[in-house]
Amino acid sequence: MKLALGLAVCTLFAGALLWAQSDDFAEYQGWMKSNAATVADLNKSLTAKDGATAHTDVRKLQENLAMVMAYWQSRNVSDGVRFALNATYGLAQVDVLISQSKFDDAAAALKTAQASCGNCHMVHRDKAPDGSFKIKMK
């Protein structure tokens, strides 16, 4: 299982790295908005103990995080890569717990994974006067 997960993450990351060579902030914002909506959906799925939908939500988050990871990698921002990778590993744990029907534990693991997202936001996100956000490269 760990080997399959590792191969899947590497494959997603390699494809995302090729894409991320462009500087498309709008697409990055799209991933962030998608992540927020998908995490909300995942929390609802976990509360409802809906494993199939929860698995789909986790996969979507992992796909987005592969793109986020590639975005930071292409800009040589190692802590951004690390934050995304830690969140991805956390989501893998969530997925395992969902497979075991341990929905409460999965919800707790999701909170831990989200902490990686929050840490990245603290380091790499500035709020503009108009309420929008800008990325800081440090």
PLM features per residue range, with description:
Residues 20-57:
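Immediate post-signal-peptide N-terminus of mature secreted/exported proteins
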Residues 64-83:
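Short, solvent-exposed, charged loop/turn and helix-capping segments
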Residues 55-60, 81-85, 107-112:
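Short, charged, amphipathic alpha-helical segments
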Residues 25, 29-32, 36, 122-138:
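Flexible linker/context regions in extracytoplasmic redox proteins
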Residues 6-16:
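Bacterial N-terminal signal peptides
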Residues 113-124:
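The canonical Cys-X-X-Cys-His
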Residues 1-4:
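Positively charged n-region of N-terminal signal peptides that target proteins for export
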Residues 44-55, 91-111:
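Amphipathic, charged alpha-helical scaffolds that flank and support histidine-based chemistry
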